[in-house]
From Swiss-Prot:
Belongs to the peptidase S26C family. Pfam families: Peptidase_S26. This is Conjugal transfer protein TraF. It is found in: Periplasm. It comes from Agrobacterium fabrum (strain C58 / ATCC 33970) (Agrobacterium tumefaciens (strain C58)). It comes from the Bacteria. Coiled coil: none annotated. Involved in conjugal transfer of the plasmid. Its main location: periplasm. One of its GO terms (biological process) is signal peptide processing. Residues 1-24 form the signal peptide.
Length: 176
């Protein structure tokens, strides 16, 4: 194959890949490469009702110093949310008005949550402080993943529901 043909092939392949990526983002598709939920292709489904406890959602984290530090530590991926963070894929665990207590695990309105162990250090041995607990304020959501090392609201607390993108629906996923 000539050098010119190789360049042409790579150019066309790059355009096709770029086009597929743009169409996927416009069409509401996301690829999950984190272990918090199954790996693979997911679709963002517009939420046509109030968010409920138990909903699996895509949400943009707020762009603030707390999440900048989380990004620097490698807890967040790069993406198209404000601050160039990738959307989180988490389950809604508590809604506004619900009481969250955190000790060695999460307790919502007096009910312990399974698979919610709280760690004092991250996977690299660095100290990580849990959320202090309290009542979820209006306009906020408390998020969770049953993955033991998940970076979720047990550490960053409730986040604004203004970042809610929609329900997370698996298209083609697998557990490694």
């Amino acid at each position: 194959m000539s050098k010119r043909a190789v360049i042409r092939f790579l150019g066309v392949a790059g355009l096709v890949l770029s086009g597929a990526t743009v169409m996927g983002l416009i069409g509401g598709y996301r690829v999950n490469v984190t272990p918090s939920e199954p790996l693979g292709l997911w679709r963002v489904e517009k939420l046509r009702r109030p968010v409920q406890s138990g909903d699996l959602v895509f949400v943009c984290p707020p762009h603030n110093a707390f999440f900048e530090e989380a990004w620097l530590r490698g807890y967040l991926r790069s993406g198209l949310c404000p601050g160039w963070f990738a959307p989180l894929i988490k389950s809604v665990l508590a809604l506004p008005g619900q009481r969250v207590e955190i000790a060695d695990r999460i307790v919502i309105d007096g009910h312990p949550v399974s698979a919610s162990t709280v760690s004092a250090t991250d996977s690299e041995g660095r100290a990580i402080a849990p959320f202090a607990g309290g009542v979820v304020p209006p306009g906020f959501l408390f998020l969770h993943s049953s993955f033991a090392s998940s970076y979720d609201s047990r550490y960053f607390g409730p986040i604004p529901d203004s970042g809610l993108l929609g329900l997370a629906r698996p298209v083609f996923t697998f557990d490694p």
